[in-house]
Amino acid sequence: MSNIIKAIEDAQLKQDLPKFSPGDTVIVQVKVKEGERERLQAFEGVVIAIRNRGLHSAFTVRKISNGEGVERTFQTHSPIVNSIEVKRRGAVRRAKLYYLRERSGKSARIKEKLAKK
């Protein structure tokens, strides 16, 4: 029985996702339906958490909008998520960056990860 469920879930996984980790700045293109039309809306921010659960994987992105912190959680393999683009790689030493919620300004900055030679 579990083999059937696994086969169905594997068929629904997205294959074209970039590798990203907490601390990375990403641009998530989200499909938004307004009345009859459907358009793409970009949500750019820092990945503060990733939850790896196969088809049920999710990640949380945080950005500052008009001086107010905004967090949005996306299902990684959802059809609503059109694309994910990694804008910059961040060097962090934690898996969950919830401490960024209490910080603002310069203390909330994340160092950029240097490329390996």
UniProtKB/Swiss-Prot annotation:
This protein's UniProt keywords: Ribonucleoprotein, Ribosomal protein
Any single GO CC term annotated in Swiss-Prot or TrEMBL for this entry: cytosolic large ribosomal subunit
Keyword Ribonucleoprotein appears in the UniProt entry: yes
UniProt cross-references to Gene3D superfamilies, sorted A to Z: 2.30.30.790
InterPro entries recorded: Ribosomal_bL19, Ribosomal_bL19_CS, Ribosomal_bL19_sf, Translation_prot_SH3-like_sf
Coiled coil segments of this chain: none
One GO BP annotation of this record: translation
Pfam families assigned to the protein according to its UniProt record, in alphabetical order: Ribosomal_L19
PANTHER family recorded: LARGE RIBOSOMAL SUBUNIT PROTEIN BL19M, RIBOSOMAL PROTEIN L19
General function of this protein: This protein is located at the 30S-50S ribosomal subunit interface and may play a role in the structure and function of the aminoacyl-tRNA binding site.
UniProt record similarity statement: Belongs to the bacterial ribosomal protein bL19 family.
Protein name: Large ribosomal subunit protein bL19
Organism per entry: Aliivibrio salmonicida (strain LFI1238) (Vibrio salmonicida (strain LFI1238))
Recorded name of the encoding gene: rplS
